[in-house]
Structures are given as structure tokens and as C-alpha cells.
Regions:
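Short, glycine-/small- and polar/acidic-enriched structural segments
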Residues: 21-170, 174-180, 193-203
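Secondary-structure end/capping motifs
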Residues: 217-298
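Bacterial Sec-dependent signal peptides at the C-terminal "C-region" and cleavage site
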Residues: 14-22
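Ligand-binding clefts/hinges and TM-proximal coupling segments of bilobed small-molecule sensing domains
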Residues: 133-149, 153, 229-259, 302-312, ...
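Conserved C-terminal helix/tail region of periplasmic/extracytoplasmic solute-binding proteins
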Residues: 287-325
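Bacterial N-terminal signal peptides
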Residues: 5-15
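Pocket-lining segment of extracytoplasmic ligand-binding domains
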Residues: 83, 162-253
Length: 325
């Protein structure tokens, strides 16, 4: 009887130690887009558990709201646009980018069939998710390059990327910025692709993983685990088509095989194998933002990006090993 009690007590103690090793964190994914695929794959393949993170996934669509939730301690990590992160830092917020999501605008500017060129968007209505979002920045890049001014078009904020397509198909707007899989659905519906920024656009950190410097400082091990789990999710997504498509299918709620395949290919090609936030992309972004706000000209890459956990994993050969699997 004493032996049974002792064994039971030991089992409970071991369970307690194991539970203690699992660190509870919350990660927000912000968009119904294939750009979230490394997160989705990491969750579905049990990678957060593998790296001893007791993870809760949260979905907050607006980056500004997600950053507010992070600053209040409700969540520890979030996907974000680099522009929003820099703006928050410039306003005094304790935010920092810890790894890349994607260093490209993986968006297509889709329009009604009769619109053939970006210049044709003059006096037209263009859909974005929110002001200050990646969709907004993508549209501004395209229309500015085409020589259109702020008074030449109207922007409508529609909340989520799928809402832009719905509104476009209903004829209530003339064009919009759509990410995969929504741009694939738009092409299949007969809409006109004016430009694919994933292949023809600039280097731009449209999605990053952010945290707070105070959290990273007090929880370096959790941050290390997060970067490695996401890095492995990224590697699996790029190398395993079946797992990648299955994750997109579940979280984007898609069943169309053609659209799933197109979405997978677009992001497989867009994701970098090692998730550094692009220095060139941040430099370009800071230069552009600095034209309107001189304070931003003083910000350095290291002020807003802490890549030590990515660098550490690269030095240890983690990404090379994952890529060779």
C-alpha cells in the first residue's frame, strides 16, 4: 500500500514538473490569409508543445487593437505590420519585432473586369481593411507609383480581406487589395489583376511577429521557443505541400483545390527560409515615414527589431537542419 501511495505521489510530482515546464502564452494571428500559415502549421503539427509552450491562439484582426492587447499584457505575441509597429514605437510604446512573417507585399490589386490599369482607378472606390494596415500601405504604394494623388480616389475600410472581395463582387467598390487565398478567388471569379505585389512589388516587411521589449527581457526562453516553433512551422510549410495546404484549408475555411494550390504556391515562394525582418525593407520604410515625421529619422533598425533569437538559431544550424528534412 505504501509503495502504491509513493508511486502515485511521484507521478503527481512528475506531472507537476512537466506542467511547470509548459509556459502559458497567447499569440494573435491577425488576418485570414496564407501569410499566417507558419503559425497554423506550428499549431496543427504540435510544434508549440514540442518547444514547451502552452499556447492559446487568438484572432484579433486589427493590428492596432492587437498591439494594445499586447501592451496591456493580455497577449504576449502578435502578428503585425512593420509600419504599425514602428508607429507604435515612435509614439512611445514598448514594442519590438522578433522575427519575420513575410518580407513582401503578398497582395494583388484586383479590380472590376473593365479596369485594365492602375491609372484607371482615378475617381474610383478602393477597398482596404483599415487605414494604416498592410492593405492600405499596398494600395498607397501602387497608386502613388501610378501618379495618383490622395484626392484622385476614395478608400473604403471594410474590416477583413474577404469583405473586400464580397464588396467588389457586389459592385460597391471598383478595386481592392487582396491577399491569398482571396486574390485566387477573385481571379477565378473573373476579376482583373492589376498587379501582383508579391512578385512585382518592393521588399517590405508586411507581416512580422512582435512582442514587447519588457516581455522579451523577462522571458527570453519563451521568446526563443516561440521563434523556433515558428521557424519550424515555416520550414514544414515550405517543404511539405500537403501539410501546408491542409492548414490553409482549415483556418481559411477553403475547399476549392485550385485556390488552395495557388495560395500555397504564392506563399511558399514569398516566405524567406530564415525569418529575419528585412533590414533593407525597414530602412526603406523608415525613410518614407521620416519624410512626414522627422522624429522617425532617428530610429534605427535595432530600435524596433531584435533578431538575436533568429541569429542564434541560424548559428546553431537550426534552419539548415530543418530545410534538409
Amino acid at each position: 500500500m505504501r509503495f502504491v501511495v509513493a508511486v502515485s505521489a511521484l507521478a503527481l510530482l512528475c506531472a507537476g514538473v512537466q506542467a511547470a515546464a509548459q509556459s502559458r502564452v497567447r499569440l494573435n494571428w491577425g488576418a485570414i490569409s496564407g501569410v499566417m500559415s507558419p503559425i497554423w502549421v506550428a499549431q496543427e503539427e504540435g510544434l508549440f508543445k514540442k518547444y514547451n509552450l502552452d499556447l492559446e491562439l487568438i484572432h484579433i484582426a486589427a493590428t492596432s487593437k492587437a498591439i494594445q492587447s499586447m501592451l496591456s499584457g493580455e497577449i504576449q505575441f502578435t502578428t503585425a505590420d512593420a509600419l504599425n509597429t514602428i508607429q507604435a514605437f515612435n509614439a512611445g510604446a514598448d514594442v519590438v519585432m522578433i522575427c519575420e512573417g513575410v518580407n513582401r507585399f503578398v497582395f494583388s490589386i484586383m479590380a472590376r473586369p473593365e479596369i485594365k490599369r492602375i491609372a484607371d482607378l482615378k475617381a474610383k472606390k478602393i477597398g482596404i481593411t483599415r487605414l494604416g494596415s498592410s492593405t492600405h500601405t499596398a494600395v498607397l504604394y501602387v497608386v502613388n507609383k501610378a501618379g495618383l494623388g490622395a484626392n484622385d480616389y476614395t478608400l473604403l475600410q471594410l474590416g477583413e480581406v474577404p469583405n473586400i472581395l464580397t464588396t467588389l463582387l457586389a459592385g460597391q467598390i471598383d478595386a481592392g487589395a487582396l491577399s491569398p487565398p482571396t486574390n485566387s478567388r477573385a481571379k477565378k471569379a473573373g476579376l482583373q489583376e492589376l498587379i501582383n505585389l508579391g512578385t512585382d512589388g518592393p521588399e517590405y516587411p508586411s507581416t512580422v511577429i512582435a512582442s514587447t521589449r519588457s516581455y522579451v527581457k523577462s522571458n527570453p526562453e519563451n521568446t526563443r521557443r516561440m521563434v523556433r516553433a515558428l521557424g519550424e512551422g515555416l520550414a514544414i510549410f515550405k517543404s511539405n505541400r500537403q501539410i501546408g495546404i491542409r492548414a490553409i484549408q482549415k483556418y481559411a475555411r477553403l475547399n476549392d483545390a485550385e485556390i488552395l494550390e495557388d495560395t500555397y504556391k504564392q506563399f511558399r515562394d514569398a516566405f524567406d527560409p530564415i525569418p529575419y525582418v528585412s533590414r533593407a525593407g525597414i530602412a526603406s520604410l523608415l525613410a518614407g515615414m521620416g519624410e512626414k515625421d522627422s522624429k522617425i529619422r532617428q530610429i534605427r533598425y535595432e530600435d524596433v527589431a531584435d533578431m538575436r533569437f533568429v541569429a542564434e538559431a541560424e548559428k546553431e544550424g537550426v534552419f539548415k537542419k530543418l530545410a534538409s528534412k
